[in-house]
């Protein structure tokens, strides 16, 4: 049997290798460290956590990422097994002893008889006619490999993300907000609009200028801004009126709630096909998360908004997966090539693990000539996979954490306070059914 090639032994690559080897499929796992280090890594361990040691909430009843933890445990995830073995006290979060965690992953991979861990930088991935290659090189993919990937995907690759906050549709106050496209173009209701008067606008701009910012990490410091994705607070620094002539311009829109003309308008654009998530247009930011929640809650209509994703700008290499990848993570133009982890546009340790797990399972089925089945969209894993391979807005695609806004709504009414738990119960039931059908 041909060996499968995996490039990158981070969380996604390590998990993909484990899933394949556990199904008796030999794997060549390439990791360039320690011979070539990244600006962020400190060791040569597989699955090294380069930022926080937290895998976020472990509450599977009220947290989408906690639900994803539980689903991954049921799928024999190596990463989750090592995390549970080396967890440290962190309240309701799953935090780990960073060194022991990555050392355990490395040991498991090195000792598996079907995994060959090769310490070598790959610039041109090997493409075998009877095998598959999984690229899981992570958010710091650079150099020759980045150039090779860019040659395969064209211009649909980014090296810096510009993430605007995303709001749950159900949490927007439509006694103040309204749906309308500028000059009533398109369907006429393509945007949600939140109007400000002059006093509200000037208070908002001042809050942006005074809000605490997140410092760049050392390896991000020299990454330039692009005029098309300036942080909103940087635009505010260029002049008090800049925003109302930019992303907050009020022209072409009529507020049905007030007769007087709006001084500035915040627009939100639909971010997924389900219509459950709405993106704050032009609001990419380096404000701290507490500052974002405080300042953006002053926008009329967003006072009680649920932010399923907050804004950020940082170094991040990722492809436009909704355009490029099939639902099985295969490059549409080269089906023998798969992508997994943060390079696909999933955001976060657990999401990268989940993507790697699915890539490994998919290739295993392909190698055996078996039909491939993706978990239903009602599960955390299925919702995340469908988001990056087609449900997301490809025109404005940016990395995404797992969240309940990716899940289909219920056909029957569920009270808001019970909704998260209901999502979780439905997900675990459907995942169990899927596992029984796809064991």
Curated annotation (Swiss-Prot):
InterPro entries documented for this protein: FAD/NAD-bd_sf (IPR036188), MnmG-rel (IPR002218), MnmG_N (IPR040131), TrmFO (IPR004417)
GO terms classed as biological process: tRNA methylation; tRNA wobble uridine modification
GO molecular function: flavin adenine dinucleotide binding; tRNA (uracil(54)-C5)-methyltransferase activity, 5,10-methylenetetrahydrofolate-dependent
Enzyme class: transferase
Localization: Cytoplasm
Keywords attached to this entry: Cytoplasm, FAD, Flavoprotein, Methyltransferase, NAD, NADP, Transferase, tRNA processing
GO cellular component: cytosol
Residue positions binding FAD: 8-13
Enzyme Commission identifier(s): 2.1.1.74
Cofactor: FAD
Catalysis performed (reactions): uridine(54) in tRNA + (6R)-5,10-methylene-5,6,7,8-tetrahydrofolate + NADH + H(+) = 5-methyluridine(54) in tRNA + (6S)-5,6,7,8-tetrahydrofolate + NAD(+); uridine(54) in tRNA + (6R)-5,10-methylene-5,6,7,8-tetrahydrofolate + NADPH + H(+) = 5-methyluridine(54) in tRNA + (6S)-5,6,7,8-tetrahydrofolate + NADP(+)
NCBIfam families membership: gid_trmFO, PRK05335.1
Listed PANTHER family: GLUCOSE INHIBITED DIVISION PROTEIN A, METHYLENETETRAHYDROFOLATE--TRNA-(URACIL-5-)-METHYLTRANSFERASE TRMFO
Function: Catalyzes the folate-dependent formation of 5-methyl-uridine at position 54 (M-5-U54) in all tRNAs.
Family: Belongs to the MnmG family. TrmFO subfamily.
Protein name per its UniProtKB record: Methylenetetrahydrofolate--tRNA-(uracil-5-)-methyltransferase TrmFO
Organism for this UniProt entry: Magnetococcus marinus (strain ATCC BAA-1437 / JCM 17883 / MC-1)
Gene that this polypeptide is encoded by: trmFO
């Amino acid at each position: 049997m041909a060996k499968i090639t995996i490039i990158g032994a981070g969380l996604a690559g390590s998990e993909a290798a484990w899933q394949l080897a556990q199904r008796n499929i030999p794997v060549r796992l390439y990791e360039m460290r320690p011979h070539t280090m990244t600006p962020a890594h400190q060791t040569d361990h597989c699955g090294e956590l380069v930022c926080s040691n937290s895998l976020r909430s472990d509450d599977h009843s009220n947290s989408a990422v906690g639900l994803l933890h539980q689903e991954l445990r049921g799928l024999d995830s190596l990463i989750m097994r090592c995390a549970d073995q080396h967890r440290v006290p962190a309240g309701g979060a799953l935090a780990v002893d960073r060194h022991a965690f990555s050392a355990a992953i490395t040991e498991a991979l090195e000792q598996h008889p079907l995994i060959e861990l090769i310490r070598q930088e790959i610039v041109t991935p090997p493409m075998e006619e009877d095998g598959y290659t999984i690229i899981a090189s992570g958010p710091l993919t650079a150099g020759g490999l980045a150039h090779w990937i860019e040659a395969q995907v064209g211009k649909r690759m980014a090296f810096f993300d510009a993430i605007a906050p995303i709001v749950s549709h159900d949490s927007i106050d439509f006694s103040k907000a309204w749906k309308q496209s500028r000059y009533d173009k398109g369907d006429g209701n393509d945007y949600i609009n939140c109007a400000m008067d002059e006093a509200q606008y000037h208070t908002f701009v001042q809050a942006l200028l005074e809000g605490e910012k997140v410092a760049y990490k050392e390896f991000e410091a020299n990454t330039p801004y692009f005029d098309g994705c300036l942080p909103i607070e940087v635009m505010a620094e260029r002049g008090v009126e800049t925003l109302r002539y930019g992303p907050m311009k009020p022209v072409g829109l009529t507020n049905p709630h007030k007769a007087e003309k709006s001084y500035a308008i915040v627009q939100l654009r639909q971010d997924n096909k389900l219509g459950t998530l709405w993106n704050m247009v032009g609001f990419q930011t380096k404000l701290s998360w507490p500052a974002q929640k405080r300042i953006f809650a002053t926008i009329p209509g967003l006072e009680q908004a649920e932010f399923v994703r907050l804004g950020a700008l940082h170094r991040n290499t990722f492809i436009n997966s909704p355009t490029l990848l099939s639902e099985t993570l295969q490059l549409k133009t080269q089906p023998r090539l798969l992508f997994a982890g943060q390079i696909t546009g999933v955001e976060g340790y657990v999401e990268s693990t989940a993507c790697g797990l699915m890539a490994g399972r998919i290739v295993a089925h392909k190698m055996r000539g078996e039909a491939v089945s993706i978990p239903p969209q009602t599960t955390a894993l299925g919702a995340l996979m469908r988001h990056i391979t087609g449900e997301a807005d490809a025109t404005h695609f940016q990395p995404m954490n797992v969240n309940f806004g990716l899940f289909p709504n219920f056909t029957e009414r569920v009270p808001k306070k019970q909704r998260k738990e209901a999502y979780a119960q439905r997900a675990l039931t459907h995942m169990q059914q899927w596992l029984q059908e796809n064991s």
